[in-house]
Amino acid sequence: MASPEPLRGGDGARASREPHTEASFPLQESESPKEAKTFNPEATLSLEGTVNLEDILYLGASGDFEESFYEEEYEKPALTLFIDESRQPDEALGLEEPVRPEEMLSVEESVTPDEVQISEQPVEPAKSPTACEGEMVATEGSLPAQPIPNTEEDPLSVEDLERLEARFQQCVQAVSQLEEERDQLIHELVLLREPALQEVQQVHQDILAAYKLHAQAELERDGLREEIRTVKQKLFKVTKECVAYQYQLECRQQDVAQFADCREALTTRAAQLSEELTQLRDACQKQKEQLQQQLEAPPTQSDGHFLQESRRLSTQFENLMAESRQGLEEEYEPQLLRLLERKEAGTKALQDTQAEIQEMREALRPLEAEARQLQLQNRNLEDQITLVRQKRDEEVQQYREQLEEMEERQRQLRSGVQVQQQKNKEMERLRMSLAEELSTYKAMLPKSLEQADAPTSQAGGVEAQSPGTV
């Protein structure tokens, strides 16, 4: 009887592959939904490491496990399955224990692919023992009688062990290839995620640069506003002084107008006085001529009296003229002097005011030019700020659209991952159900073999008697 050590050696290999199998689940979850649709249950079971794809294909794709076992066991009784009787069926096959690839290989290698004939008719998974016995009898009746080897004393041959080892090496190579594919897919996923992360970082950097430019523009705007406020204050002061000087100029102009009116009045008065003086001179000249004529005439008594009277009148006239002249001089000379002084002062003040106004105009010209330049700069800065805001709004809108696109892609990837996880869970449930069915079939296999041994021995005895009778 062969020991089950080669089969236990496969347990260590299976245990060494279990971490890789567990690590392959995130890779399956991270794949896209399109890739998930190409997976089938058989490939998923091969990725899990418990049942190989070739083993499942070898057992038959058109029927289930029960049909394959019955056809493999009863088509050729000479090549029966080896079962280790030193272990109890409950210990060897548990429902909770995953199916081992080595056990599947031990079941497969007993029957060659050329000897397996898969029935095309569908077979019900739950057959009664009587139906199984009927099929065995029909199969044995169609086959020639062959000697039944003793299953208890026939161990595994060296060729079977070599084939098992080769098959195990193939499984190990397949697992390593799957691990390489998993690493490659993880690397591709990382490479696919890197552009999105770089785009997000670039967007954040652009937003920070836009905020910096905005802050710098605001600082420049505040500085220009402060300069404009200072220039406005200076301009206000200059305007205030200009208005004050203009008021003084108007006052001086009014004084000059008043002085001109006084001058005209004095000129008119002087003309009147000159006319009166001329008239008085004419009258005096006439009287003088008359008196001279009287003097030239022969003197008479009346003439002496007239001469005395004329001398008296002449003296009175001279006294009157002197008094009137002195009165006029006393009355108008101070006013004339004051008017002359005021005229000179007004002329001098007017000249000073005109000089100051000219200086202020010359000083106001660069300020006006500077104010126009500052207004132009202010308009340019406002236009630049408007353009920067528009550009920032456009960039923010573009960044938002890109962010929405990336969020949409992220949602799609998440939905694909969820679909893949759900499919993986379904595959896991299918694998567990297949493993449970396989363990159930393995548990039922010894009983079916025992039931098949009795009809086979009876058929052999009948055939042995038939040649004797002949």
Curated annotation (Swiss-Prot):
Principal localisation: cytoplasm
Family: Belongs to the intermediate filament family.
Protein name in UniProt: Syncoilin
One of the record's GO cellular component terms: cytosol
Coil 1b: annotated segments: 220-297
Source organism of this protein record: Mus musculus (Mouse)
Originating gene: Sync
Any single GO BP term: intermediate filament-based process
Stretches the record annotates as Coil 2: 338-445
PROSITE patterns given in the database record: IF_ROD_2
Compartments (UniProt record): Cytoplasm, Perinuclear region
Quaternary structure, from the entry: May link the dystrophin-associated glycoprotein complex (DAPC) to intracellular desmin (DES) filaments. Interacts with DES and DTNA.
